[in-house]
């Protein structure tokens, strides 16, 4: 009998804290954490570095065959992104790359290009995977589905703090506008739009700190998976 692997899908808008909470939950449970947003960021970074326009579908698709993406996991269990052999884990966290990711992720061909990579990880590991369409498209049969959200204002504040800690100060109003625009783009795109799966639990962390959010997330998981 093949071993049973559990999959936890966490979806939600930009800046909702998906990656931070999913990473902490994976460490708590001993699961593999898969940040799918990092994969799209890597594609966007590759296109931009080569002089391509991420908003031009033809230019993006023309560059796909040249892109070699790999994921590795260090002893700390953290995911590292490799682009044609180069570790770009830090580079993809620059604020501009977030916009690139939103653009390239709107193309069905890009999503199809990356789908098998994501599903293979879930076939062979206990995984916690976060993104925009994990519970609806990538892992529709996930054992646990959570739609994680927070108000745009709270997400902008959190993102500001995160960027400041990285030495990348940004204007709050500008960031709030970018988040609002990305929410619209992600939820209105033709390919795998951002939406809550019908069988997903909703977790709004607007009024919760990190510890309370993590405990609430853990409670949802324990209701659905025998841990």
Segments the model singles out, each with a brief description of its role:
Residues 1-7:
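Extreme N-terminal, non-catalytic leader segments
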Residues 10:
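Hydrophobic anchor at the beta1->P-loop junction of P-loop NTPases
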Residues 14:
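The conserved Walker
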Residues 18:
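Conserved lysine of the Walker
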Residues 21:
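Hydrophobic positions on the alpha1 helix immediately C-terminal to the Walker A/P-loop
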Residues 27-93:
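N-terminal phosphate/diphosphate-binding loop that engages ATP/GTP or pyrophosphate donors
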Residues 73, 118-125, 132-137, 141, ...:
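Small-molecule kinase domains that catalyze NTP-dependent phosphoryl transfer to phosphate-bearing small molecules
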Residues 89-166:
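ATP-dependent NMP and nucleoside kinases share a basic, alpha-helical "lid"
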């Amino acid at each position: 009998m093949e071993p049973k692997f559990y999959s936890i899908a966490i979806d939600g808008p930009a800046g909702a804290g998906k990656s931070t909470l999913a990473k902490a939950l994976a460490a708590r449970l001993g699961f593999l954490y898969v940040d799918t947003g990092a994969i799209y960021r890597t594609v966007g970074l590759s296109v931009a570095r080569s002089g391509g326009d991420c908003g031009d579908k033809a230019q993006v698709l023309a560059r796909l065959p040249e892109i070699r993406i790999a994921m590795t996991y260090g002893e700390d269990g953290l995911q590292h992104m490799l682009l044609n052999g180069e570790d770009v884990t830090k580079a993809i966290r620059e604020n501009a790359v977030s916009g690139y990711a939103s653009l390239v992720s709107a193309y069905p061909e890009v999503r199809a290009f990356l789908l098998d990579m994501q599903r293979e990880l879930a076939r062979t590991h206990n995984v916690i995977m976060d993104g925009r369409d994990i519970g609806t498209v990538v892992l529709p049969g996930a054992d646990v589905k959570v739609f994680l959200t927070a108000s745009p204002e709270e997400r902008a504040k959190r993102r500001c703090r995160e960027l400041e800690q990285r030495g990348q100060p940004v204007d709050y109003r500008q960031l709030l506008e970018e988040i609002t625009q990305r929410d619209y783009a992600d939820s209105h795109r033709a390919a795998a739009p951002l939406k809550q799966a019908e069988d997903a639990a909703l977790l709004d962390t607007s009024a919760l700190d990190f510890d309370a959010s993590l405990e609430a997330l853990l409670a949802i998981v324990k209701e659905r998976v025998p841990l």
